Amino acid sequence: MSAREEKHQRGSKRPAARREEEAGCGSWEQADLGNEERKQKFLRLMGAGKKEHTGRLVIGDHKSTSHFRSGAEDQKISDELEHQYQQSMDSSLSGRNRRHCGLGFSESETAEEKAPPPPPEHPPKTESESESSSEVSSEEEEEEESDSDSASDDDTAHKRKPTEQSDKDIPDSKDPKSNYKMLFVKSTGS
């Protein structure tokens, strides 16, 4: 072909024969799939099958919907649904199903529950020391019990979380994760 013919072909439309071939790609009815049963199954799976109507459908003709509810029944059903909704919200917010909270879920209660107990105030004693000071230790325990009964809730919370003391040492940061990381770094460093 000459350059003139190529230029003419580039600007011209495609011949009609190609259009017919391309249109054949979407017509599944003409595909040879074997017997009629396989063809119908293929068309149904592809969503191109003709749907057969089994009869006339009348809205509200079903037996279960043929009766009308009274206002009292509607109110009772809506109250029951609201009650069920409130129960599910309360149970999900109470933390009963914590496994559904997702990654990174943290709550102040979980930190208190999993926190290790504080170390004993007195160093462990040997057997000879413990026998001689058994009377003294029982008096000390009684004093500690009376002190703990009179102590406020803030003091007990303070004993449970020794890391809260260092919150004052850390510069103010509004991100609680940042504070936690800094506390962890400070506690491991010293």
UniProtKB/Swiss-Prot annotation:
Ranges of compositional bias, category Basic and acidic residues? 49-83, 162-178
Record's compositionally biased regions (Acidic residues): 129-154
Q: What domain of life? A: Eukaryota
**Pfam name, any one:** SMAP
- Annotated signal peptide: none
| Compositional bias segments (type: Polar residues) | 84-95
The transmembrane segments are none
Q: Where is this region: Disordered?
A: 1-190
Enumerate the InterPro entries for this protein: SMAP, SMAP_dom
Per the record, the similarity remark reads: Belongs to the SMAP family.
Recorded protein name is: Small acidic protein
Please name the source species: Xenopus tropicalis (Western clawed frog)
